[in-house]
Every structure is written in structure tokens, then in C-alpha cells.
């Protein structure tokens, strides 16, 4: 993403992971600050937040069912032992964390973002229109004076990046020198610049700030005019001057004065501009592509009233400082939702997420979006992320938004730019995986992005120019190695919790900046608490399902403990929520019963015929009373196991939903048994049985008018899962073929035709499930996709990887 984005409303918002150069915070009760100057929040790593007693308890009926549905939150003994007498319970910690995040999401404005000393200095340079010789915005100079760091520099206090510290510091020195104030601070800052300028050569080029090669040399020229001499003959500076000359020769002057481009973001570094023409390219808010420094430069040259209004509003909003870009409303809305989804805690915030996506959809255009609303310039990063989230949540969005970014067989991050950003192409890849049938531009995007990312990974070049994050190679690697069709929610969350850097992730613009509503430790700590709580419940369920396995001697019918574990893992990694325990266990037990019957009787046609006959007899007589059945001992044992399990599931559903689903369960099983009897093929009808069982256990029903769509979903799901099951059976004793990063297959392989058909059918299924215009409950449709993705995972994931995922998801606590 070229820049970034956020949201709007005018209530003061609670602050999270904040800094001295952030908009002054209104802290949450319970957040402790290290000093009055440094506003960074200190988080207690053992819990989320303790709400101060002065804050009234908040009722949250909208998510109470998520926290309590007769299934208690699990508190490990070791956690209990460490708790202090006044420490709140795990349930309350989660509830308080949820309340805090709800408060954040409910108070989003135009973007919570850190202050940029560089941009603040540019605004400080503006001369008062009515009183020449004095600053137009004196509070910016006060901010500069108050925020010099102990090492005499200005910039991000928690990450030392030479580019960032130098450009911030030199800009502040120039501002102080221009108005002849704070000479000691100015001298100290100048010494820092001279001592550190040679370090530029040692930093990763990918982490060079946006437009640094234009902006920094321009600052050096301004410094010379003020009598500030800075040696610029070091090799690093010579390289920067070379890049500047090259970039300036590539700038299409005729275009930039007539058509909105990203160059509007960096006008302060460009010489010989026609301001009369450029003023016509202002954004609606008076800014030049939402850049305070660019707009300040424009104000100096034009005295434009709209530029003044934009800057004046920012200076007042942020108490003297200004960010490097503003607003960032779309960026904040989109990325906050993405983080909550990937951290596995989105279920707590469904209304807030819906509100965020409604906001994004309101400002969506046929050409995509950028980081802020009402922009005439778009970027592929925000467009890709917005497209993906909107489509996932049932909004109708056209892939034609990507046409303007297509350049031959490649895609560019911003129209007119040739260099690529890893995260921009990564998010394009993620978006392209949600393609519907006949969306050729997404097919091309997926192929290009997959190849691009794979080459970068091979070359160990997964550094990004837009963000410095904890584990970008891990994020990209997971996307390449686990196709979205095979991505199980709990696997993604377990790994992403380790990849997400919380408040330590830093964004790269003209300066380093922070987005505390996107990257913060509150999300992270809540995700950890919730994950471990869910995992504790899963461990209890695993113990109970092993008892069920032993009670009915499932092992005696040929199903191993290993098979039991894998089956329970797949169900749990797909449906993990504590409140969905009955659905999860029904899935696991149903799948085990199917595998038991299929493996034990599959090789004997006689027994395959006998079992359905006995099943019919038992169903007709009714097994409620546990009557002993005629027939062979094995058949009798299996029949008893099936009906005892079905009756137990029915009782669970009756308790949870007040509905007797016994006849429907029997009917679904009868259909599967007859299908199996006729063919006995791998996976034949199993997906339908699982989907029907899960939806019944969840209390989901569909109307008569939706029957045709329901049957179409069943047919497509059965077809795909049957093909996947057949493929898995053929390849279970050899290494599964890895789906290529471009989403395709090697067509020289004789099995490729069927795999391509699977991909085609998957696209159709995804379209049916994500299409909201048909009126069917999305939860019902989502079950079809969830089950199908589990089959895809099983078919195409290497056994060693499955073992790793099982260990991580079920048995390794998050710390």
C-alpha cells in the first residue's frame, strides 16, 4: 500500500498503543503510562486490561452468547495459581478486552496515527500571511521543541531507522533555524545529522522512506540557504543524488500537472512546479493527496485558503503536530478488520465489523480506493484488501477495479510506478484467491502475484517498503504454501498470533508512523487469552472423544487413535468457537463413524449389503431403548454405536435449540448408507452428511423456496469433496502434489485435468456461498464451504505439515 487508511466520527476516542508524538490520548481506565511525556501504553502481559473500579460495568448482550452458552470458559490450574486475590477471572479478562476493542472500533474517526516531525516541521515553516516574519502555526514549533529525543534527534522513539531520524531531525533543525528559536536544540540536532549521515549506506534499501531520495536532498538545499552546512560527499549521499536525478528524469511533468498522481504526495521535494495548474488537483479537503508537508509547501506558494483550512484543522486536531498523511480512514477500517479476523477474535465484534465494511463500501469506486476516502488516486494494496474483505462478507464488488493496475502481464502497486511492494502484491494474491468463475483478471493476478512472491522468497528478499513487521516472510510463506481453499481458520490464527507484532509493527511513509488501531497489544493479548481458553476446551473435548472411542471399541473396527486425532483436529481447526462445541463434536464423531463403516465393510460386498439392511431395521424399530439387534456381532456393534451416537447428538441439539432433530439425522444417515451401499466409493455422500449434521446441530433451517439452491450447493459440494477424497486416497501413501503458487497445476500430469475441474468447481461454490443476493442465511451456506475446505486441506496438505499443525493448534499453548 502506497500509504494507509482509517475512519471518521468526531467523538474523542480512547487511545491504545500511543506515543509522545501521537494525538494526546484519552486513556482507558486501567492503562498505565510510563510518564506524562511518553504516552506509550504499558501492557500487563499476564492479562488484557483491568478496568478501573470507577468505570461502570458494561452490559454486552450482543456477545454474551459467545462467552457463555452453557460451556464454561476454561481456566487452567496454572493460571489460577498465579492469580492475585484481586485479579479478575479469565472470563472477565476476555470480557474486558472485548469491551476495550468495542470501544475502539465504535469511536473510529479519520484515523488514529502518530505524529510526523518532518511534516510538522514543514507546517512550521509556513509564514503568517497577515504578519510576515512570524510563523502561521506557532504551536507546531512548540511541538518540535517538546519532542526532541534524548539522543538529540526527532523521529520514532522506539525504532532507530537512520533514514527516519535524519529526515525528521534535519527538517526540525531547519524549522527552528528559520525562526531563530531554541538554538541549543537546533545545534544538538545538527550534530546528530552530521554524525549519522554516513550510516545511510548500512540500511536496507527496501526500508528507505517514501520519496526520501527527493525530499532529503531538497532539505539539504534549504539548510544551505539558511547557512547550515552539512557534508554531503559521503558515498551514501552520492547514491541518493543519483537516485534523485534518475527519478526526476522519469517524472512526466505534463501529466503530473493535469492528472492526479502519487506525485501530489511529495510536492515539497519537486522543483519548478506550475502551482496554478496543480491547485486544480487538490483533494476535496484542501490537501494535496492528504499530505501535510506537500500541502504546506503548496500553501507557501499559493496562499490557497483550502490548503490553510486543511492544515489549520490538523494542527488543532493533533495539538501542534501533524501526521505524515491524513486522513487514513479507509486504511484503518480495512486493516483493523483484517487483523481481528486473522487473530481469531472477530466473532466478538460482528456489529462493529459490519459497520466498518459498510463504511468502506460507501466509498468504494469502480477504480478501487486508496488509504483515504474521496481520492482520485488509488493503490493496489488498499484496493486488494478492501476487495477481499467486502467479497468475503457478501458485498458485490467487481474485479474490474484491478484493470488500471495491470501493466502487460504484471500488476503495479500504483499507476505510473514501476517498483513493487511485497505487501501490495501479497494482498493482491490474497484477494485473487476469492475469484469467481470467468474472472480472468483475477486468474492473471493470482498467477503473477504467486510467481512474484515465490521468487522473492527464494531469493530471501521478503522485505517490504511499506511496513516493518515481525514476520512478513512467515505471512507470505503461509499464503503460498496453504491455498485459501485449504486454509483452516484455527491453523491460520495459531500461526498469525506468532507473526503479528502488535504495537511493535511500524509503517513506512515519508517517515515511520504507527497505526495503533491496526497494530496494538490489546488485540494481541485478547487473541492469546481467547486462543488458550478455546484450546483448553478443545483438550477437554479431545479427552472425552477418546473415551467415546474406547467405549465403543472404535479401534477394533480399524480406526486408529491417529485417525481419530486427525479427524478431531480438522473439525476443530474449522469450527473452533466454544459456543459451537456440539457442532464440532458432531462433525468429528460423524466423520469417524463414516470412516469406521467404510474401512471395516468396504472390501466385502456381502457385508456392504448387510449393513444397510440392519441399519434400516434398527431405524424402523427405533433404537431409543437400546434394543439388541440380530446379525453378525460386528454389524450389531456398529449399528449400536451409530444409533447411540445419533441419539446423543439429538439430545444435545434438543438442549441447545429446543428442537428434536432425530428424524432428520436418521434420514441423512439413511441417505448416506444407501449411497455407500451402491458404490462404496471414497467420500461418496460424506460431505453432504457432514454439512447436514452440522447445520442441524446449529439449529439452521432453510425455507422451501431455498430448496433448489440448497440442493445445488449439496450437488457441488458432493462433487468436489468426492473428487478430493478420491485424490487423497490415491496419494495417501506418497507425497501429495503441491498446488503451485500460481494456483494451477502441471498440465503434463495425467491427474491435472481432474484437479483443474476441482478448481473450477471450487470457484463456483465460492460464488454461491459468498453471494448475498439469494437471501439464504450465510451461516447455512458457509457450512458447505467450511466442509469442502477441510476436504481440500486433507487432500493437498503433506502429512508432516498436518502433524505440525495438529501440535500447534491442539497442544501448544500461546505464550
Swiss-Prot record:
UniProt key word Transit peptide? yes
**GO aspect biological process, one term:** diterpenoid biosynthetic process
Q: Which reaction is catalysed here?
A: (2E,6E,10E)-geranylgeranyl diphosphate = (-)-kolavenyl diphosphate
Motif DXDD motif mapped to chain: 379-382
Q: Its function? A: Diterpene synthase that catalyzes the formation of (-)-kolavenyl diphosphate from geranylgeranyl diphosphate (GGPP).
In what way is its activity controlled? Inhibited by high concentrations of magnesium.
**Keyword Cell division attributed:** no
- SUPFAM superfamilies noted in UniProt: Terpenoid cyclases/Protein prenyltransferases, Terpenoid synthases
Alphabetically ordered keywords of this record: Chloroplast, Isomerase, Magnesium, Metal-binding, Plastid, Transit peptide
Q: Which gene encodes it?
A: TPS10
- Provide the protein name: (-)-kolavenyl diphosphate synthase TPS10, chloroplastic
What Pfam families does the annotation carry? Terpene_synth (PF01397), Terpene_synth_C (PF03936)
